Each structure stands twice: as C-alpha cells, then as structure tokens.
C-alpha cells in the first residue's frame, strides 16, 4: 500500500488529525482533533479542485443539480477553529448559509460523502486546504464616525458590527449612540450597501419610556447608556425596564467621576438584570477606580476594547491623548485633565489580561475611532492570548497545543457577542444553519490579514494582486473589495438586526433598504453563564488608594509586554 508522510500529506491536502499549526508568529499552537474530509480512515478520496485533480465531471463532481440539493459553494479541507472545536472538514454553503460540515464529493464513486456536500455542476469551489476558517468576527463596540471604517472592518475579518453614531458629530465621536427614529432610519439606509451585518444602538440615557420605545420601533437593536449623556441610576433602571419588556440588550459606559453614585450604586440600579458592560477595565470609561469588579457578577456581560489589549510598555502613553480627543476634553482645564488621568491605571489594565485568560471578561470589541482601532479586534485578541501563554503557560487540559486557550479567545469576538446581543440564531459560529460569514486565513497570517472574507456565501474581501496582471498573485497583493462587496450583492448577503417591535411596526416599508431586517433574539435571560468558555465569576477587589487589583485574593503583578507578535514583522508602519 502506498504511504504518505505527514509532511507530504499536509503539502497535498493540508494538515490532518494530530497535526499542529502555529498561529501567525505567536507561541500559540492548535491541534486538529478530527478530520471529516480525509486523513486517517478517509485518505484517498479528498475533494480537491484543479487540473488533474479530483473535482472533475464523473469523478469528484456528480450529476446532482442545484434543484436536487447540490451546494452553491464548497470550501474544501479547511481547518475550522471555533468555540466548539478544532477540526478539518469541507464546508457546504447554499443560499448564503452553512448547510453541511463534513466530506464533499460524489457519492456515486466515493464513500462517506455528506448528503449536503454532493458536488454538482452548480457548485463553486473555494480551496480551504492548508488554511484556517473562523466565523466572521463581531465587533460589539463601534462608533459610526466615518464610512471608511467599514472597509477597515472587513479587512480585519469583521462581518458584523454592533454600533451607534451618525458621523463625525460630537455625540457620535464620544458615544456609541444613533439617537432617535430619524437618525436610525437614515443610518440603516446609509449602511445598506456594505457587506456587513448591522445592529444599531439607540440612546438609553432617558427616564422616558416612550422615547426608548419609539427608537425600538425606528430600528434600534438595543440601547447604549453612556456617561457623556448622563448614566444615572434612574436612567439605568428606566432603560433596563424597557429592555426587559422588549427583550433587547443594554450596553453601559458608567460614571467615571462617580457623580451620580459609585459602582455599588450602579449595580444596585441594575438589580441583577442582564447588561453588557463596555470596556470593563475602565481606561475607556467607567467608575474609577473599580469598575473592573463588575466582571465578577453573574448578570454582567463584560467586554474589553482593543487599545488596552494586551498591556504593553506603550499602552499608558497613548491613552491620555486619545481620551482627551474622544470625550471633547480641554487639556488646559485642570478638571478635564484630572478626569482623563483618573481613567488610566496600569494595575487594572494588567489585571484585564488575566481576566481574559481565565474567561472572566467575555468579549473584545474595538471602540472604533473613539479610543480603539476597528481593524485590530482579531489581532489584539490573539496578541493577548500569546502574552498570557508566555506568562502562564498552558491552560488546564492543554499539553502539546493550545486548543483550550484558542477556543476561549476565538469565542470572545464570535459566539459570545452574538449571544449577548441576541444574534446567535444567525451568526457567531461555524455551524449549520447560520449565515456563511466565514474568514479564511493563511496560518502564517492568521489574525493579521485574511486570505478571504466570505459574507453570506460570497467572497466580499480578499488578498488580491495587481488587477492588470496575467494571474491573481503578482505584487502588490493588497486587501481589496470583491464582487460580494458590490452594493446589490452586499444587501442580498447581509442583514440589519433590529428589535422585534420594528418589524411588527412595519419599519421595512418605511425605509429605503434592500436587505432583510432580522429581529434580535430575547436576551433578558442571558448572563455570564451563557458566555461559552468565558463564564468565570471571580472575586475582584481594587484598593481605592493604590489601585492594586486582587483576583480571588491574589495580587496580579504588572508585567507589561515589551515585544509582541503580529506586529512589525507584518507591517511597515
């Protein structure tokens, strides 16, 4: 019997069960635990496209028509990295959704072909062999300040944003809010032609229930409570009362100056109800110095924003100027300067690293253009994982590879924000039935620059060479929009997430959008326990004088990183 070495097999078909893959230039390795497309037990029938290869007529390609169930697209031999596992498989896509994960081919001549992966004349092939596939990232904290961020998001592997804003207005530069039905309608129309799913946040800073209900009918998918609009206990309670009735999520940026109360008063106003706490560490805003303690509460869904990820020797220096600009502060006013300095604490930023590694902070977003970078959500997440691997070693259950850590960290920008915002019925993971929002990565560039971004079954963004060249690969190879980013295609492959009340009130008939409006799921029963692999609730204490952080009684010492992977090895600037 002919034998192939593992090295030769990987070169031909991609790695298989038991092989390990390094993620970019980090210290992180993932190990394939199962190969549904080939490998041990299935070797010899791998679905591979190309000259002289398998997926040809009456060989790997069958006669099955689209009407008889052939998929529109098959991604062959991809390594799937998701919260539920790390496996290799062929992925079937039909009508813009994932329809099968298993083995593709022609059952007339092959064994083990998945019924949903029967390749036919109507099937397109994307080669995933040797590549990693993740679910499209969800940026759960986006300021809509300029439309150019949408391209940057796609270029970083993001396919969904939870966002607020109307452009470069002062309210939008500081707060993630699209206030009122008129602005919500215009922004839903403006965003209709981009190949990203959109969930807009209305203004929750009011004690007027009707002011919030009209925003839900106008297209808001949830609310933002921001200190710059006055996050008082009364506003918190009023907002959550409407959220409970509507089933939507509230996102909170608490009172840095402790003017209307301290963290204890905010928690009392929340009354144990589900709430998403933005930039839980506090440099992005929130009760000084101990907002980070909310990460230990079972009803609070905590997230970070990426400028503090991970803690490095440069983190503190860049934050002061960022904060002054974002919150319309005047450096010549001593009170404004004191306000800014109170938010930037190395001890809590350092503790944020550990809280991510133990799964106590569940999500990572960008805070785009408002102290964060939308194109770096994925990259900063894996840099944090690398720093924690170097400092803490393997997580429990890991020995030769970092599967437990990899699954925990990928969940922070995929399934966890999807669950938190009621989007998980449509997106957030590589699972059958969900939108085919998928990102393909070359392992050497994992988390840095995608090979291709598939949005709703179409390639919307990809690394592409000179368009006037004779082949697709000549330099300069740059991230570029593809046909899936064309306006009509983008609308057909993406959705606007809105509150159920908007659909019931006929919003689709009142606004000029071509994409489907999808109701968010009810999240009022979602707590930390529902955050996959990120459900820890440690006891967190912050000394009010020294800002020393204790996590389950232990002091976490500051050791800012001096060098990071996924950095200047990949970028000129």
UniProtKB/Swiss-Prot annotation:
Task: Please report a single Pfam family linked to this protein.
Answer: Amidohydro_1
The enzyme's main class, written as a single word, is hydrolase
Q: Tell me the residue numbers annotated for binding substrate.
A: 226
Q: Which residues form the Urease domain?
A: 136-573
Q: How is it modified after translation?
A: Carboxylation allows a single lysine to coordinate two nickel ions.
Annotated SUPFAM superfamilies = Composite domain of metallo-dependent hydrolases (SSF51338), Metallo-dependent hydrolases (SSF51556)
Cofactor binding description: Binds 2 nickel ions per subunit.
Q: Which GO terms describe its cellular component?
A: cytoplasm
Q: Where in the cell is it found?
A: Cytoplasm
Q: What is its EC number?
A: 3.5.1.5
Looking at the keywords, is Lipoprotein present? no
What GO molecular function annotation could you give as one example from this UniProt entry?
A: urease activity
The record's annotation in InterPro entries points to: Amidohydro-rel (IPR006680), Metal-dep_hydrolase_composite (IPR011059), Metal_Hydrolase (IPR032466), Urease_alpha_N_dom (IPR011612), Urease_alpha_subunit (IPR050112), Urease_AS (IPR017950), Urease_asu (IPR005848), Urease_asu_c (IPR017951)
Give the main location. Answer: cytoplasm
Q: Which domain of life is it from?
A: Bacteria
Write out the residues that bind Ni(2+) 2. 224, 253, 279
Q: Which residues bind Ni(2+) 1?
A: 141, 143, 224, 367
Quaternary context: Heterotrimer of UreA (gamma), UreB (beta) and UreC (alpha) subunits. Three heterotrimers associate to form the active enzyme.
Which protein family is it in? Answer: Belongs to the metallo-dependent hydrolases superfamily. Urease alpha subunit family.
What NCBIfam families is this protein classified in?
A: PRK13206.1 (NF009685), PRK13207.1 (NF009686), urease_alph (TIGR01792)
Name of this protein: Urease subunit alpha
User: Which species does the entry assign this protein to?
Assistant: Mycolicibacterium vanbaalenii (strain DSM 7251 / JCM 13017 / BCRC 16820 / KCTC 9966 / NRRL B-24157 / PYR-1)
């Amino acid at each position: 019997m002919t034998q192939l070495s593992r090295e030769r097999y990987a070169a031909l078909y991609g790695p298989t069960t038991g092989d390990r893959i390094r993620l970019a230039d980090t210290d992180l390795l993932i190990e394939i635990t199962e190969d549904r497309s080939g490998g041990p037990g299935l070797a010899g029938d791998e679905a591979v496209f190309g000259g002289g290869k398998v997926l040809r007529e009456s060989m790997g390609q069958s006669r099955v028509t689209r009407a008889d169930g052939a998929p529109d697209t098959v991604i062959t031999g991809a390594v799937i990295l998701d919260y539920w596992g790390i496996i290799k498989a062929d992925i079937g896509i039909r009508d813009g959704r994932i329809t099968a994960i298993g083995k593709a081919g022609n059952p007339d001549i092959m064994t083990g072909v998945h019924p949903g992966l029967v390749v036919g004349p109507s099937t397109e092939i994307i080669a995933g062999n040797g590549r990693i596939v993740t679910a499209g990232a969800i940026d759960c904290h986006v300021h809509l300040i300029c439309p150019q961020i949408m391209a940057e998001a796609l270029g970083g592997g993001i396919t969904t944003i939870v966002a607020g804003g109307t452009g470069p207005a002062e309210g939008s530069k500081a707060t993630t809010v699209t206030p009122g039905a008129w602005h919500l309608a215009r922004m839903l129309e403006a965003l209709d032609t981009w190949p990203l799913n959109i969930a807009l946040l209305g203004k929750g800073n009011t004690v007027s229930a009707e002011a919030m209900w009209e925003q839900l009918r106008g297209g808001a998918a949830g609310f933002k409570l921001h200190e710059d609009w006055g996050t008082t206990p009364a506003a918190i309670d009023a907002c959550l009362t409407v959220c409970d009735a509507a089933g939507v999520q509230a996102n909170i940026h608490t009172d840095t100056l402790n003017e209307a109360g301290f963290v204890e008063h905010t928690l009392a106003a929340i009354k144990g109800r589900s709430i998403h706490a933005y930039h839980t560490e506090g440099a992005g805003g929130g009760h000084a110095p101990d907002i980070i303690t909310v990460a230990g509460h079972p009803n609070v869904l905590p997230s970070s924003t990426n400028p503090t990820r991970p803690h490095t020797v440069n983190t503190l220096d860049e934050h002061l100027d960022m904060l002054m600009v974002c919150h319309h502060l005047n450096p010549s006013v001593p009170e404004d300067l004191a306000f800014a300095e109170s938010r930037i604490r190395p001890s809590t930023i350092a503790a944020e690293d550990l809280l991510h590694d133990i799964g106590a902070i569940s999500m990572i977003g960008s805070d785009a253009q408002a102290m964060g970078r939308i194109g770096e959500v994925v990259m900063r997440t894996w840099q944090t994982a690398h720093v924690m691997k170097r400092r803490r070693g393997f997580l429990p259950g890991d020995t030769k590879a970092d599967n437990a850590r990899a699954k925990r960290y990928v969940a922070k920008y995929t399934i966890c924000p999807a669950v938190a915002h009621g989007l998980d019925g449509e997106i957030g993971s590589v699972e059958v039935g969900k939108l085919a929002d998928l990102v393909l990565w070359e392992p050497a560039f994992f988390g840095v620059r995608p090979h291709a971004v598939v949005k709703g079954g179409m390639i919307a963004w990809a690394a592409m060479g000179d368009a006037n060249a004779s082949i697709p690969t000549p330099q300069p190879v740059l991230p570029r929009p593809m046909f899936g980013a064309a306006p009509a295609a983008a609308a057909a492959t993406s959705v606007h997430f809105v509150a159920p009340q908007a659909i019931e009130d006929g919003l689709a008939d009142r606004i000029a959008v071509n994409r489907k409006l999808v109701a968010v799921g009810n999240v009022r029963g979602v707590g930390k326990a529902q955050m996959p692999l990120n459900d820890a609730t440690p006891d967190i204490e912050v000394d009010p004088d020294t800002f020393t952080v204790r996590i389950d009684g232990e002091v976490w010492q500051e050791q800012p990183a001096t060098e990071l992977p996924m950095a200047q090895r990949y970028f000129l600037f």
